[in-house]
């Protein structure tokens, strides 16, 4: 049962092809589905492929609450530095490639796991001084960029050949906001020979996985109902509270709801469900010596949920 007013509200896991921007994918989805309210979760470079989840209708209001962790498979190419940190850029330096054993590589990659600081590349969409970095890059201007905290959970070597030491295939699990091209660049700087990213595939974005994605061509042939994921499924990582039927009118008005005794954290996001259906998301607040859930995003739902 879909509690929302429109059947075309939820999340779609799109398989972005190389050669399209994330904006292109959203624009095409708008035309196919005839839905204006569409937003994507996490830009993919035009040359990259893989998982690009999009939100439809009211689900666009929930994008910020979707898990942001990502998984990638990437090609690392040694011996070059480019102005874009990937294979599409202009080569600015070339260096001899060192000979490393697989064991030496595994030890080196351990240095790039865990919490660290990363400086976004000039070709990214990060805003500095009111402009996107890629806008500066197009003008040939390099500006100082503030570093960002990221987390690399895992780096595994998928493919390595001693007779071709200039190329590795890596699997990376990381936090949202991590730039794989910059990770490749930093590895090259650590080795002193430079490195760039070749191809890139995003295999997972939050709960969305490559094997469950659909292509734009499939979407053109008709939206399969099982491909539309409900907001409640996507936000399963958030704690849940059940709303009593008599409190539904108060919820619609955005009034705070009493939370059962628990060690809540101020500002913690909570799913607000009725009969297992997501109707709103709120935040825990401490007020009048008790915990309340203050609705922040109340969805418009069909009255059929009361039947």
Curated annotation (Swiss-Prot):
Domain of life (superkingdom): Bacteria
Tell me, which GO biological process terms does this entry list?
mRNA pseudouridine synthesis; tRNA modification
Query: In the Enzyme Commission scheme, what number(s) does this protein have?
Result: 5.4.99.25
Keywords attached to this Swiss-Prot or TrEMBL record, sorted alphabetically, are: Isomerase, tRNA processing
Q: Keyword tRNA processing, does the record have it? A: yes
Q: Which residues form the active site?
A: 45 (nucleophile)
Keyword Isomerase among record annotations? yes
- Classification via Pfam families: TruB_C_2 (PF16198), TruB_N (PF01509)
A GO molecular function held by the record: RNA binding
Catalysed reaction(s) here are: uridine(55) in tRNA = pseudouridine(55) in tRNA
Question: Per the similarity annotation, which family is this?
Answer: Belongs to the pseudouridine synthase TruB family. Type 1 subfamily.
Q: What does this protein do?
A: Responsible for synthesis of pseudouridine from uracil-55 in the psi GC loop of transfer RNAs.
**What is this protein called in UniProt?**
tRNA pseudouridine synthase B
- Report the source organism: Heliobacterium mobile
Corresponding gene?
Answer: truB
């Amino acid at each position: 049962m879909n509690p929302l007013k429109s059947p075309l509200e939820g999340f779609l896991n799109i398989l972005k092809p190389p050669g399209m921007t994330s904006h292109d994918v959203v624009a095409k989805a708008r035309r196919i589905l005839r839905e204006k309210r569409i937003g994507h979760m996490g830009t993919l470079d035009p040359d990259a492929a893989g998982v690009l989840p999009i939100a439809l209708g009211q689900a666009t209001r929930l994008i910020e609450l979707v898990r942001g962790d990502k998984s990638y498979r990437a090609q690392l190419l040694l011996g070059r530095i480019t102005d874009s940190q990937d294979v599409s850029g202009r080569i600015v330096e070339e260096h001899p490639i060192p000979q490393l054993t697989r064991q030496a590589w595994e030890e080196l990659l351990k240095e790039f796991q865990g919490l660290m600081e990363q400086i976004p590349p000039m070709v990214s969409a990060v805003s500095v001084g009111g402009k996107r970095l890629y806008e500066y890059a197009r003008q040939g201007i390099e500006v100082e960029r503030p570093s960002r905290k990221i987390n690399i959970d895992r780096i595994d070597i998928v493919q390595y050949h001693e007779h071709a030491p200039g190329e590795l295939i890596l699997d990376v699990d990381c936090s949202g906001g991590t730039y794989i091209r910059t990770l490749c660049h930093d590895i090259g700087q650590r080795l002193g020979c430079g490195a760039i990213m070749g191809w890139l595939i995003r295999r997972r974005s939050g709960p969305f996985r490559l094997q469950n994605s659909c292509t734009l061509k499939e979407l053109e042939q008709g939206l399969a109902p099982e491909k539309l994921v409900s907001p409640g499924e996507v936000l399963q990582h958030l704690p849940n509270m059940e709303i009593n039927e008599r409190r539904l009118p108060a919820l619609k008005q955005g009034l705070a709801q009493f939370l059962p005794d628990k060690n809540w954290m101020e500002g913690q996001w909570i799913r607000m469900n009725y009969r297992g259906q997501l109707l709103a998301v709120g935040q825990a607040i401490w007020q009048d010596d008790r915990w309340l859930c203050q609705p922040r995003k109340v969805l418009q739902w069909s009255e059929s949920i009361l039947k």
